């Protein structure tokens, strides 16, 4: 009798898992169901472009039916409850499983900063990107009617909290988009203040070479971006934010990209978790329940060298492959596979014409040449997930 495998989450890790498992096992061996209430996969690494209107919604949403193997059944329903003891998943219906794979991703982490959750715009999901888009456009429309200079400046100050990959990529888009919005709305671009606030000694801490990071900072400065490091946010209100130094920065727009934690969905699961709520897994991607696996951002794994699995697409995909292999072994026999991360590096956008690359085979550099390389990486992913058709769609939506 075929074993039942239920996957919750249709992001990078969830889709990679079902694609890999369906290649390893036939429908006689396994019945695979993927639960994703939206019915689409969001190309989340590109949502900063959508937030600032460089690409359309269609460019970052991939219908799951287009990329899932025919042997995988898509359930476009919200999972409301999981009964680990009886191995059941509940939507409006109930489903039995032999193996459960949790791939629900992560949520923003506000680190208990007073007022942050209530007053900042988080930047993590597609819905967040849409809210940011609506908010910034509304600011530029409303400011035309404001005469008070202090109020105008507060409205035209845009702060990104967090100088990691996500925050810098968003600022890269904001600095170009606010140019356009200023012209459209008759606003003096020089009156627009852009700021990155980072608690650590420098932005982009995962980029090895400080001189390369400094080049990116210099590029952003050409657009008037003020990069503040060693600047921890201690309080946020509707009218601004306070730094640990005591400085108050008046603003109506704080966009928070300062960290993530385990998805709140997992709170119901009686599984071992780390201090950020992520599900602890071993090298086989197994949780404290032998029939439950966790992959991607929701998984917390520390290897024998005390290295933490980072929240990157590459690590999500590799964790999915390991889980698929080990569930296959549980069903058919064989040797388990331990996770041995092979990360090739990172490339991030700093606007449309500039990027920062940290690639093992090529080194670390900044400049225009990082952009075509980033497109190549994205197209490689599109081909891997959905074949040549998705590559052509990517070229149409984002290159030509």
Briefly describe each language-model feature range.
Residues 10, 93, 104-105, 245, ...:
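Glycine-rich, N-terminal phosphate-binding loop of Rossmann-like dinucleotide-binding domains
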Residues 146-151, 307-309, 328-360:
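Active-site-proximal substrate-binding core of FAD-dependent oxidoreductases
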Residues 352-400:
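C-terminal auxiliary extensions adjacent to catalytic cores
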Residues 72-81, 175-281:
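A Rossmann-like FAD-binding core segment of flavoenzymes
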Residues 118-149, 240-242, 248-318:
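FAD-site-proximal beta/loop scaffold in flavoenzymes
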Residues 1-4, 73-157, 255:
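FAD-binding core/adjacent interface of flavoenzyme oxidoreductases
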Residues 1-73, 158-159, 168-207, 255:
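Beta1-alpha1 glycine-rich phosphate/pyrophosphate-binding loop at the start
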Residues 176-179, 314-341:
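Internal hydrophobic alpha-helix adjacent to the cofactor/substrate pocket in enzyme cavities
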């Amino acid at each position: 009798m075929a074993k039942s495998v239920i996957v919750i989450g249709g992001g990078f890790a969830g889709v990679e898992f079902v694609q890999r498992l369906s290649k390893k096992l036939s429908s006689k061996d396994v019945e695979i169901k993927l639960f994703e209430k939206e019915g689409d996969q969001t190309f989340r690494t590109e949502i900063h472009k959508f937030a600032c209107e460089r690409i359309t919604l269609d460019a970052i949403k991939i219908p799951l039916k287009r990329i899932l193997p025919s042997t995988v059944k898509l359930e476009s329903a919200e999972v409301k409850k999981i009964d680990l003891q009886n191995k059941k998943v509940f939507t409006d219906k109930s489903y039995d499983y032999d193996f459960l794979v949790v791939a629900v991703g992560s949520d923003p982490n506000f680190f208990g900063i007073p007022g942050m959750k209530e007053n900042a715009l988080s930047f993590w999901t597609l819905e967040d990107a849409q809210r940011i888009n609506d908010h910034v456009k509304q600011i530029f429309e409303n400011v035309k009617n404001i005469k008070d200079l202090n109020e105008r400046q507060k409205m035209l100050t845009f702060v990104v909290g967090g100088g990691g990959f996500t925050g810098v990529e968003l600022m890269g888009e904001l600095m170009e988009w606010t140019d356009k919005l200023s012209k459209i709305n008759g606003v003096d671009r020089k009156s627009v203040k852009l700021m990155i606030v980072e608690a650590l000694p420098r932005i982009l801490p995962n980029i090895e070479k400080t001189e390369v990071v400094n080049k990116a900072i210099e590029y952003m400065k050409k657009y008037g971006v003020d990069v503040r490091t060693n600047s921890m946010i201690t309080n946020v209100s509707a009218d601004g934010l306070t730094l640990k130094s005591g400085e108050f920065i008046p603003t109506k727009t704080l966009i928070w990209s300062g960290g993530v934690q385990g998805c709140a969905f997992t709170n119901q699961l009686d599984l071992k978790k780390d201090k950020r709520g992520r599900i602890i897994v071993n090298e086989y991607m197994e949780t404290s329940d032998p029939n439950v696996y966790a992959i991607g951002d929701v998984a917390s794994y520390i290897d024998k060298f005390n290295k933490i699995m980072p929240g990157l697409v590459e690590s999500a995909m590799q964790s999915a492959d390991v889980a698929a292999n080990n569930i296959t072994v549980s069903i058919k026999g064989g040797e388990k596979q331990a996770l041995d991360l092979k990360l090739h590096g990172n490339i991030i956008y700093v606007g449309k014409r500039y990027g920062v690359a940290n690639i093992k085979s090529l080194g670390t550099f900044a400049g225009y040449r990082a952009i075509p390389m980033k497109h190549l990486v994205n197209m490689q992913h599109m081909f891997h997930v959905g074949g040549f058709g998705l590559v052509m769609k990517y070229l149409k939506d984002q290159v030509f």
